[in-house]
């Protein structure tokens, strides 16, 4: 039997408004790196994240992320750009859906999110 989570009775991947540092590497449909950088998340869930960056990326681009959950825990995930909004010229709010993540990374994200639960 698995441990009960605050999120068990909510949507599959609840979003938590939390700023954490990430390193990103956007790749086009040919797997060519088109932009790398550092940003902070606007929210985070076990299924994805969103953040603001200056990279003009497109929906369906692949992104490799290193997410710094806290001072000790960092996880690497691969995701797909689900949507892009342009709040101001030169700024891109990017929604990422996680695609590939080791179980250990998923467990760290769940533990981190549970630590933020009321």
Question: Model features per residue range: what roles?
Answer:
Residues 18, 37, 63, 75-77, ...:
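Hydrophobic core residues within well-ordered beta-strands of beta-rich domains
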Residues 68-73:
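Short, charged beta-turn/beta-strand-edge "cap" motif at the junction between a beta-strand
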Residues 26-59, 64-66, 95:
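Short strand-loop-strand
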Residues 41, 79-81:
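Conserved hydrophobic positions within beta-strands
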Residues 22, 79, 96-98:
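A structural signal for short, well-ordered beta-strand segments
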Residues 83-85:
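PAS-family sensory domains and close relatives that share small-molecule sensor folds
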